[in-house]
């Protein structure tokens, strides 16, 4: 029957196509594994040319390429070059034209690092590098010199010394701080005795002398006004 013959012919054609594909695969594998380096390079160049042509047909215009310049496929010279030495084509970059203000050189003395001057001590108000920029659109901030770190460390040490001296002066007037220092040093009893002796001497020097009695003795013991413990310490 004709239908059965057509089916047999189609099945035979499919079998022949599969055999051809298998043969081509085997030939390709043999050429890659057993062929010389020239054949491999030629095959790689042909594959790359085919891929580039397909990519050029899919994307007619490249966004990076300037208008009016068509993409050219690699010629026979490019195919003859080995694949390991071939380089991708350079793509031109479109850059905006620079303005005259940005291209022009900055005026001399426009930038000066405030912390770059060695030997100059900075205060607490400006511990970081501050670049003094002159008026003008072309003046740009620049890097500071290497001495700014050394100046910052010196200023910090001076500030710590000032704070330590100020704290010591304030500690003499603070009774709680003085009491803490005496307790830690172990001189609390000595300081209390010294202050009591000073108070007794002050009272004896300023107080009126008591009148002597008929027996030539004193009418009573001397009255000594002692200060409270809070005022002593």
UniProtKB/Swiss-Prot annotation:
GO BP: canonical Wnt signaling pathway; regulation of protein export from nucleus
Keyword Ribosomal protein appears in the UniProt entry: no
Region Disordered: start-end pairs: 1-24, 204-233
Pfam (any one): GSK-3_bind
GO CC, any one term: nucleus
Family: Belongs to the GSK-3-binding protein family.
Subunit: Binds GSK-3 and prevents GSK-3-dependent phosphorylation.
Described function: Positively regulates the Wnt signaling pathway by stabilizing beta-catenin through the association with GSK-3.
Name of this chain's protein: GSK-3-binding protein FRAT2
Organism: Homo sapiens
């Amino acid at each position: 029957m004709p239908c059965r013959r057509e089916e047999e012919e189609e099945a035979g054609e499919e079998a022949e196509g599969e055999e051809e594909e298998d043969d081509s695969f085997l030939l390709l594998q043999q050429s890659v594994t057993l062929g010389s380096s020239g054949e491999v390079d030629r095959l790689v160049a042909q594959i790359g040319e085919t891929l580039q042509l397909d990519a050029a047909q899919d994307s007619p215009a490249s966004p990076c390429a300037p208008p009016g310049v068509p993409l050219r496929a690699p010629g026979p010279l490019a195919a003859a070059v080995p694949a390991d030495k071939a380089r991708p084509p350079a793509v031109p970059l479109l850059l905006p034209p620079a303005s005259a203000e940005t291209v022009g050189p900055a005026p001399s003395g426009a930038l000066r690092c405030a912390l770059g001057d060695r030997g100059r001590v900075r205060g607490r108000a400006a511990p970081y590098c501050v670049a003094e920029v002159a008026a003008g659109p072309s003046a740009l901030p620049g890097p500071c010199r290497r001495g700014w770190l050394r100046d910052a460390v010196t200023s910090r040490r001076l500030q710590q010394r000032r704070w330590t001296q100020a704290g010591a002066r304030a500690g003499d007037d603070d009774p709680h701080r003085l009491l803490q220092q005496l307790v830690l040093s172990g001189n609390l009893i000595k300081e209390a005795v010294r202050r009591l002796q000073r108070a007794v001497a002050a009272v004896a020097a300023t107080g009126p002398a008591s009148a002597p009695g008929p027996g030539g003795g004193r009418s009573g013991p001397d009255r000594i006004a002692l200060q409270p413990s809070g005022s002593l310490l």
